[in-house]
Design a protein with these regions (language model features):
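Basic helix-turn-helix/winged-helix DNA-binding cores
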Residues: 1-110
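Intrinsically disordered, low-complexity, charge-dense segments enriched in Lys/Arg
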Residues: 103-176
Length: 176
């Protein structure tokens, strides 16, 4: 079954994801080419297709124009700029640009460049710490939903069952 193979590959990929830790982000200002290269290299495993672009200069400029990303200092992007771009990258698969802006603007106001207290790096690290336990839960949930969907449509014609079971699996994944 194609879906079962896909699910196994997805589980393998989820286990192998190596999220960017803040220590991997350079502590020096990067120019735009360095930022796009860094993001492409670090997030290569997240590409769906080999020729997909993780981040382009146009995207960075649009994020800055739409106040998602603070302007660079003397054309250099700081570690906090890169962290902001990471949040945008992860969120854009789930949220609209306006929703991302609503979420990130208060974060930027309170924590971008904050030298006296918590900063964006602290926020990123706190969120990243949640990842390992949540990934395990996600894998278990995927398996449970797949097993549940495999039990559906038993009374339907046999040649339709696999398609309908796959359909029910996708439906289970889309419930809020």
């Amino acid at each position: 079954n194609e879906v079962k193979e896909y699910l196994a590959a997805l589980q393998k990929k989820l286990v192998s994801i190596d999220y960017i830790i803040t220590e991997d982000i350079p502590n020096i200002g990067l120019n735009m080419d360095q930022v796009t290269t860094f993001m492409d290299e670090q997030l290569e495993a997240c590409k769906r297709y080999e020729d997909d672009k993780i981040l382009t200069k146009t995207m960075i400029n649009n994020y800055a124009k739409n106040n998602l990303l603070p302007a660079p200092e003397k054309k250099k992007y700081s570690k906090e700029h890169v962290l902001t771009l990471l949040f945008i990258y992860y969120f854009k698969n789930l949220l609209s640009i306006n929703d991302i802006q609503s979420l990130l603007n208060p974060l930027t106001e309170h924590y971008f460049g904050n030298k006296a207290g918590f900063n964006k790096e602290d926020v990123y690290n706190e969120v990243l710490n949640l990842e390992s336990t949540e990934s395990e839960k996600l894998l278990k949930d995927l398996g449970k939903k797949y097993a549940l969907s495999s039990e559906t449509f038993r009374k339907f014609p046999e040649n339709d069952q696999e398609f309908l079971q796959n359909f029910s699996f996708i439906c289970l994944l889309s419930y809020d």
